[in-house]
Amino acid sequence: TNELEENKKIECMENVVLKEGFFAETFPVNKAESAKMKIKKLPVEVGEVSETFQCAFENSGIMKDGIIYTIKTVPSYHGKQITLGDVMETGQVEEQYFIPEEKLYYTNPSVTHSDETEQRLPKEDRQTWQYLKGAKKLLRTSATGHEYVFSEGAISMIDQDDKPARTMLTSEGGFSRTTHIVKDKMTGRVRLLTATEAERIQGFPTNHTKYCLVKGKTVEMPLRKRRFMMGNALVVNLVADMEKTLDNIFAEE
């Protein structure tokens, strides 16, 4: 009986995630091939969550009564995808956005990892985008004096313009692993995103953040602040789609 009840509960949660839930209705998904619902009970004590809790979360899921249900899904969408290339400038871009050649690579461009467990690379090498976005292994010391090997995997150095843009963070445009760098459409040179490209990625009109009010006066917003604003923003198109689902819920109440 307990097993039947448990299976019924799992089936119910799967139905919410895949069909009847708020996000499933707004952004339809299908269960990935051979995917199974994973279940994990959340510890009652907050301290235990911080110290010992581990869970291999999939890309979709729900939590109810302290129990996590998570499953791998794939989008059920066959319409047009807005790619990074769709929002990129096609004309001339200001020189300030371009990355100097010496800041791109410190060695052969095909190298995607560095091992610094024996010796650290020179500072000038570590200040290149190749190093920043590449895989790494280096020794670190914890607060208690324990030495350990820190490692992280490689990510794509130059973002592909034939795919949707990655999520932007507030650090966009800074020397960060998550910053987008692209090949300029006009020159082929590598550069950062412009403020207007960042706006378009998030679904805002071009130059939406160009001006701001400071002490009652309209002034141009600094580039760094414009990027921060877009990194902190929600994607307008997604919010618009969610509003439709919410509107239906309210109408049926």
Residue ranges and their predicted role:
Residues 1-84:
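Flexible, glycine-/basic-rich loop-and-beta segments that form/coincide
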Residues 57-253:
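C-terminal target-recognition/interaction regions appended to catalytic cores
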